[in-house]
Amino acid sequence: MPNTTSTYEPLVLVNTADLPEEEWLEYRRRGIGGSDAAAILGVSPFATARDLYYDKLKVVSYEDGESNWVQKKVGHLLEDLVAEIFHVKTGFEIYQVKKMFYHPVYTYMLADIDYFIRLPNGKTAILEIKTTNYNAKDHWWLSLIHI
């Protein structure tokens, strides 16, 4: 049984700063990211576990005919603004590390973190930006647990 009390430093899979989206998707297909958790557990309104499986194998991508592409595009465009608002309202220092990480033991576990927060005590925390409404929280909480 694995030791669940240990902490691990994540390893860098790839620098994502100038990575084209299609290449980013290829790296993402190598493992399971936070966005995949709800589909795996069968609670995602956007994809089933089979959709995800096919996407990972590049058989077919459930993202090809997305009906929610507008929400995703707007959400992506608003991420920096929401992070700035968070910074102004909390006073916490925020910063980005444009890299995709993986777990050193469970190498299939991937993370692409939106922002990091430097807390007043010097510790680092994760800021995952979601531009949605409160009623949709059940659709994204699993991705946060994955991190």
Placement of each model-derived feature along the sequence:
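A short acidic/basic microdomain associated with nuclease active sites
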Residues: 87-107, 114
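Short acidic, glycine/proline-rich loop/turn micro-motifs
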Residues: 65-66, 137-141
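Residues forming well-ordered secondary-structure scaffolds
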Residues: 77, 81, 108-110, 122
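A structural signal for short, well-ordered beta-strand segments and their strand-loop junctions
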Residues: 42, 95-96, 126-128
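Charged, glycine-rich intrinsically disordered N-terminal tails and low-complexity linkers that flank
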Residues: 1-77
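Conserved catalytic cores of phosphodiester-cleaving nucleases, focusing on short active-site segments
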Residues: 86, 113-136
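Conserved small/polar residues in nucleotide/adenosyl-binding loops
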Residues: 145-147
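Acidic-basic catalytic patches of nuclease active cores, encompassing PD-(D/E)XK
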Residues: 72-96
